[in-house]
Amino acid sequence: MEMSYTKIDLNEWSRGKLFKSYIENMRIVMSLTVEIDVTNLIEFSKRNNLKFYPSMIWIVSKVVNTHDEFKYSWNDTGDLIKWNFISPSYTEFHKEDENFTKLVTEFSDDIFEFSKRFMVDKEKHEADRAFCGKPAFELF
């Protein structure tokens, strides 16, 4: 996976002063719960022989990646950056032992490509009970 981003100059960025105020003076937490009708996604997944879970992960990832505001982070030297894209982290639950694996699959704009990557990652880490994949800074 190629990790590519653009470095942000806080002094030149139009939102730089506001960003500094929030980061320096406020505790920032975001949580969101909404009801969403997934009927069309279920039908699409069935018609295209896709599993629902990776389809759901993909569609949320697609929306997140259309908003630059969700792609800001810090690089390893502490610079503010904006990722070109971010990849989802998700949990794969193991019924047999009630454990889980936390996985990351590289995002693709194409649902079919993402679904293939998802299944490869799932199979590759089937026996793992850990956090697997990319470092936490380029994912959500």
Model regions and ranges:
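Small-residue-rich loop/turn and linker elements
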Residues: F70-V104
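Residues at beta-strand starts and edge strands
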Residues: I28-M30, L50, P54, I86
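A broad, low-specificity signal marking well-ordered, structured residues that form hydrophobic/aromatic
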Residues: L32, P88-Y90, L139
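Histidine-dependent nucleotide/RNA phosphoesterase domain, centered on the 2H-phosphoesterase fold
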Residues: I59, K71, A130-G133
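Flexible, P/S/T/G-rich "lid" or insertion loops adjacent to the active sites of thioester-utilizing
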Residues: M1-K46
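Helical lid/core segments from catalytic subdomains that handle acyl or acyl-like groups
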Residues: H94-F140
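A generic secondary-structure boundary signal that marks alpha-helix termini
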Residues: N65-E69, A127
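Acyl activation and transfer enzymes in specialized metabolism, enriched
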Residues: L41-T66
